[in-house]
Every structure is written in C-alpha cells, then in structure tokens.
Amino acid sequence: MALKNVIGIDHAVVMVKDLDKAAENYKRLGFTVSPRGTHSAHMGSGNYTIMFDPDYMELLGVLTPTEHNAPARAYLEKNGEGIERIAFTAVDSAEGAEEIRARGYPPVGPTDFERPVTMPDGTVSAAKFRTFQWPTAEAPGGVRIFACQHKTRETVWIPELMKHANGARRLKQVLMVAPEPAAEAAHLAKMIDRETRNEADGAVAVPSGGDRADFVFLTKDQLGKRYPGVSLAGLPARGGAGLVIAADVAAAEKALGVAGVNSAGGVVVPPAAGNGTMLAFVKA
C-alpha cells in the first residue's frame, strides 16, 4: 500500500563544488535560476533553484562544513558533482516519518529549516520546509532520498522563475546508472511502497507516485544506447546520471547551441557540461 503522506518526486538535488559557478553554467544552458539562498546555520549549505511545474531542480553547495552536510561532502569527495539525492513531496512530514518507521526505516528528522527569499518586488520573505530522510545507508543506486513538506509554496514556486529560455517545463525521468538495475530498482520500490516496471531495453522503472517523474535504473551501457552520440564521461558506474526534462525541444536546441547534442529525438547536454548531470530535453 503506497505511502499516504509521501507523493512523487518533488525535486532533484545536484550537488556542486562551486555554487555560483554552477548557477552561471545553468544560466548559460537557458535556465532561469533563482537568487542564491542560504539555509539555516545547522545545514551549512546554500542553493539555487530551477523551478518547473510541479517539480524543480536544486543546485546545492556546502558553505560551512556541519554534521548535517557530512554525507553531501563525502559524496562530492567520492563521486564529484552530480545528482546526490532526490526529494519527494511530503503532505505531512511528521506523519510521513512515522509511515516509513512502521515499514522498518527509522527516519532522520523531521527537521525544520528555512532560507530567506528575495521576491520579485524586492521584498524579503522566507521559504520554510519540514523534511525527513530515509536512513542515509539506504541509498538505492547510490542516491539518498528524503521527503520535503513545503510550508510556503508561494516563496518557492514564483511565476517569474518558472519560465525558461530553453523551454523546460517539468521533470519526466530521473536516470540512475547501476551495474544491477533490477536490484537497485527493487530496493527503491520497497522503500517507497511502489511497483517496478520493466522496460524494453532491460532498464527498470519505478513510478514515484501521482503524475510525477519516474525513476529509471539502467546500466551505463544501456544509457549510452538510449542516447547515442552523447559522451557519458564523468559519470560514476553507480549513481544519479541525468534528468529527462519535458520541454519545447526547438527552444532547447536554440538556447543550448553547441552545448546540446541531438539524440533520441531530443537535445541532450552531456554530464560534463551539466555539473555531472546529463540533461535530456524531450518533447513535452
């Protein structure tokens, strides 16, 4: 039975070494990037968001080493930049935490935090969240998962931030590479109480819930066959590999220019040009 307080993918977290440089890179790729946010002191992190509907991407960087960001720092040290964790939307984080506890996963949290937000009219407000994590050791495909309850959606989904020159509209898939995709997919499906779905090329998908993006687990070789002509240099053998983004493909092609590679009926940014994250723009 699916979790009642956890619905599908809320956002993908791309861990980066230099936050400001990463934001500039994503602007060059045609994304509208939010002003920089600084999280509560115990988090020790800062971010930029790239807002879609109903989901988003987060560029996350460590500003001050803290106990809370130790796993993120360890990830950067081991893997370099890339998709470090995936957030689900939480309806109620306290109840969601109890739901996963009942399924044998002691939750980390709930944790409350916030960050100041400069609104389009120049006023300063706050984005407030309550999150909980599955145990950090439970990382299917090498990617941690957590759930995020948005207390102030109006300071996160700001209309001016949701229009992108590259035509990006929403996340369609989170691509995860692994030597044994079926085992990793089964691990995730158990954690979120969902079913797996076998795909024609041997990849295994896990719907995240609702109408949100799917997880797709596949080998690096399978990923290469899905996106011929796209260099996968820099991707780990096991970990978050990329995001499939529903978009206006013509707008993406124009905005990306030489950074984009025409492949699989869309236009693709190789991971080396996307801070360790392959970005595949496909027809919305």
For each feature predicted by the language model, list its residue ranges:
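Glyoxalase I/VOC metalloenzyme domain signal
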Residues: 2-9, 14-34, 52-112, 119-284
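Short acidic/glycine-enriched loop/turn segments that link adjacent beta-strands
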Residues: 41-44
